Design a protein with these regions (language model features):
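Alpha-helical scaffolding within the catalytic cores
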Residues: 13-25, 62-66, 172-180, 198-215, ...
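Acidic-and-aromatic substrate-binding clefts and catalytic sites of carbohydrate-active enzymes
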Residues: 7-18, 39-41, 54-62, 144-146, ...
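Substrate-binding cleft and catalytic face of glycoside hydrolase catalytic domains
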Residues: 25-46, 53-193, 197-199
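Aromatic- and acid-rich polysaccharide-binding/catalytic face
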Residues: 24-36, 135, 141, 190-196, ...
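Glycine-centered flexibility motif
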Residues: 6, 170-171, 219, 225
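Boundary/entry segment of secreted carbohydrate-active catalytic domains
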Residues: 1-35
Length: 246
């Protein structure tokens, strides 16, 4: 218990009793695999019915409730994953009126949607699970390309790896805003992280480092999540160590 050793899990994975017992025996942190991602929590019908173009509505589906209830009942701290991501975020979230075929909204509208989305997610979860220990949250996920620059603008559902966030904002300003809003609404003591993969690629590592360093100096970001999709042949120990020590 000197530090956290965690695992990612989903509703399906914790359903068998053996899996529950394994998690409780070996880990003291859980990251919901899909259950806190935007496409799981956003409610298009409720957002349209609400009639407020800047206030996306959220829900807690059965899959999310199952994982969070398991963690709350067993005093398992969780790491929230994730508020802002180019993937698993429905296109309608970026469209006028939350309509499937609506025009892309302005930065000013998206600012308010992002803030309200983060607020609504946190408020909804805290209200239903008041004893849940959310000790960390991945605020922004996988915003960088391997060359160290931002992802190309566009729909990830049309162009693999493209970002509607970049389509709306055109630069990394949405990352700063996401951390600003998250810091405003997450529970007291919850640490905020930028999360990505392949940080051991030097160009990507340096791009992430420069951004996170600036966020940290502004007291907005507490650290970096390294997904560590590793094999025995790549990356080398030297590359991985260089990324950690950066």
């Amino acid at each position: 218990n000197y530090f956290k050793i965690g695992t990612a899990t989903t509703q399906q994975e914790i359903a068998p009793l053996n899996n529950k017992n394994l998690i409780l025996h070996h880990f003291n942190s859980v990251t919901p695999g899909n259950e806190l991602k935007p496409d799981c929590l956003l409610d298009q019908n409720a957002s349209i019915a609400n009639g407020n173009n800047i206030n996306p509505q959220v829900k807690i589906p059965a899959s999310t409730r199952s994982v969070l209830k398991f963690c709350e009942q067993n005093n398992l701290p969780i790491r929230g994953h994730v508020f802002v991501w180019h993937s698993q975020t429905p296109d309608w979230f970026f469209n006028e009126g939350f309509e499937t075929n609506g025009a892309t909204v302005s930065k000013e509208i998206m600012d308010q949607r992002m803030e309200n989305y983060i607020k609504n997610v946190v408020d909804t979860i805290v209200a239903e699970f008041p004893n849940l220990n959310i000790y960390a949250w991945d605020v922004v996920n996988e915003a960088f390309s391997e060359n160290g620059g931002m992802r190309q603008p566009g729909s990830n559902y049309v162009i693999d790896g493209a970002s509607r966030w970049m389509e709306v904002y055109g630069d990394n300003s949405f990352i700063y805003k996401a951390f600003t809003y998250a810091k405003k609404y997450v529970p007291e003591g919850c640490k905020l992280y930028y999360n990505d993969y392949n940080e051991y690629i030097e160009s990507k590592r340096d791009g992430i480092y420069n951004l996170v360093k600036d966020l940290h100096e502004k007291n907005l970001c507490d650290g970096v999540g390294m997904q560590s999709h590793l094999s025995t042949s790549y990356p080398s120990v030297q590359l991985y160590r260089a990324a950690v020590e950066k």
